[in-house]
Amino acid sequence: MGCDDGRVEKLGPQAGFTAVACISWDNRLRLPLAGSLGLVRVDGVDATSVLAGLVLRLGAAGRPVLLDSLTIGGFNIVSPPGVERLTGSPVLAVYNYRPSLERLESGLRSSRLPLAGVRARVLSLVEEAAEASTPHGPVYLVAWGLEASEARRLVLETQVYGRKPEPVRIAHYTASEASEALRRV
């Protein structure tokens, strides 16, 4: 299963919401099975509960959840331990670049968002990012509830066109289109 947010046009307290999509994926057939949409507040604190709700709505509790970052909708942070606690699902963030805790914390400080300390504690997980080589190039994995070998295997099974796992890529396009449709309403 892959989850991602749509385009975020504006950050800060007046930003509103953006769409988030979760797409369940069949590794054997290499195709999407179902999807679900939700809304998260940009720079809010609801990403973990919204993603967990989408996972449960898709009947995918216990199945790994792939992300392309621990941030959704600006600095709305996904807590891997929280998702696992709510759904029983391990979480794997697959970065195309080595994530920088220093840059994330700097952005978080300058944003002056509430609960900055809690957000920073979750973001500190990126310090554990492990490089993994794939046929499409290197990726950096932040895994919660998965062994390193299992995380790499999952990435290899879900890569189709590039380094980003296909269910995450499809979730991004789905959420982006939904976000665009919301802006037109």
Swiss-Prot record:
Put simply, this protein is called UPF0215 protein APE_0476.1
Q: Which residues form the signal peptide?
A: none
- Ranges that cross the membrane: none
Pfam families referenced in this protein's UniProt entry, alphabetically: DUF99
Which lineage is the organism of this entry classified under, starting from the top rank? Archaea, Thermoproteota, Thermoprotei, Desulfurococcales, Desulfurococcaceae
In the record, the note on similarity to other proteins reads: Belongs to the UPF0215 family.
Species of origin: Aeropyrum pernix (strain ATCC 700893 / DSM 11879 / JCM 9820 / NBRC 100138 / K1)
Q: Gene3D superfamilies this protein is in? A: archaeoglobus fulgidus dsm 4304 superfamily
